Amino acid sequence: QPKELMQVDLPLVSTQNCSLLYANYDPSTMICAGTRQGGTGACNGDSGGPLVCEFKGKWYLEGVTSWAGVPCASPSKPTVYADVRKLKSWIAAKITGVPVLRVATNCNSVINNTLKSPGYPNSYPINMFCVYRVPIPCDTELVIHFNSFHLENHVFCWYDRLRITDGSNRVIGTYCGQQTGRSVLVNDTVAVLTFKTDRSLNSSGFHLSFSFFRRAVCGIRPTLSGFIVGGTVAPINSWPWQAKLRIAGNFLCGGSLIQPEWVLTAAHCVEGESPSIIKVTLGAHYLSTAQVVGTEQYFDVVQIIQHENYKMPKPFSNDVALLKLSRPAVLRNGVGLVCLSDEQFQRPFNKTTKSCWTTGWGTLFYRGSQPKELMQVDLPLVSTQNCSL
């Protein structure tokens, strides 16, 4: 293993391309990055670490290092990451804080931070048309959680449906049938929920809860020019959201600071572990705890939230977990937040110019040693279709 944090710049691989490369690739929760010729990528010990891409001067967390072909960085075997964009609603739902206290509606069914369909839990009326407007304060995103959701089902939701749009009337989703447990994220100044029923069959309706996901300044790193396999030693403090996880004193995995109290890592890193034996270091550069750069912050873990559908439907599907730190991190030199993936960012799949980076203290080659410092590598994204076969 390296003794310093390593970095590598990787091209993203499109869904189409990734599906061709791996039978266990799950396009609903995974994303690929790496080069066709191999030689660069993540390896043992990099699990849980970040795959970040730059967009308009900010860095966005696109993936959480999950798994790869054997040996590491083989030709046509890109690294596979949990897809943060597809899992963002789940992440936000787990770490939200401030409840929404007012909702404007013409159906008079809102009480504080919950919304129930008319008549709930009994059958909702026929021929209903209700519009609910949820104002979203500045610098927050709204998470709508479906505590219970049962509407008449149809493949296109033609009969009874709940449609969620933003303030620009952009459709975020249209829902019917059984959707209990779903979370929906709205990033705008208002969310509009339209509930429409027809004149025939009905069901018990829905019970929704609303909460805010407060955005902080994120994705800012120092202006620096730079073995994860084939990578380089990362400049000190150049990836301020990089977390180092230790279990019972031994290096375990990487992670990313997404809120002052929350680190996102891979579910397989912490599966079956107790929070009390996991320690998190932020602002670190060296693998060894004996070598410091002066920006380190040390934390206990008080809670682990593993994705409920980890390993479903395929091995390593939904491979994410949240670690709640014992106190908020102090955001200063060497420690900062990474932005969660944003749909505004057009992912640069299959670009010849490398555009995304992964970092960690994983082994420099298959069954090799770990570096002393944090490593980095630039990788291309691989399309889902090419990664799935």
Swiss-Prot record:
Domain (CUB): residue spans on this chain: 103-213
GO molecular function, one term: serine-type endopeptidase activity
Domain of life: Eukaryota
UniProt entry tagged with the keyword Disulfide bond: yes
InterPro entries xrefs: CUB_dom, Peptidase_S1_PA, Peptidase_S1_PA_chymotrypsin, Peptidase_S1A, Sperma_CUB_dom_sf, Trypsin_dom, TRYPSIN_HIS
Pfam families membership: CUB (PF00431), Trypsin (PF00089)
Disulfide bonds: 18-32, 43-72, 157-176, 253-269
GO biological process: proteolysis
Subcellular location: Secreted
Claim: Transmembrane helix is one of the keywords in the record: no
Expression by tissue: Component of the acid-insoluble organic matrix of the aragonitic skeleton (at protein level).
GO terms under cellular component: extracellular region
Chain ranges of the Peptidase S1 domain: 1-96, 228-389
Chief location category: secreted
Keywords of this entry: Disulfide bond, Repeat, Secreted
Family of the protein in this entry: Belongs to the peptidase S1 family.
The protein's name in its UniProt record: CUB and peptidase domain-containing protein 2
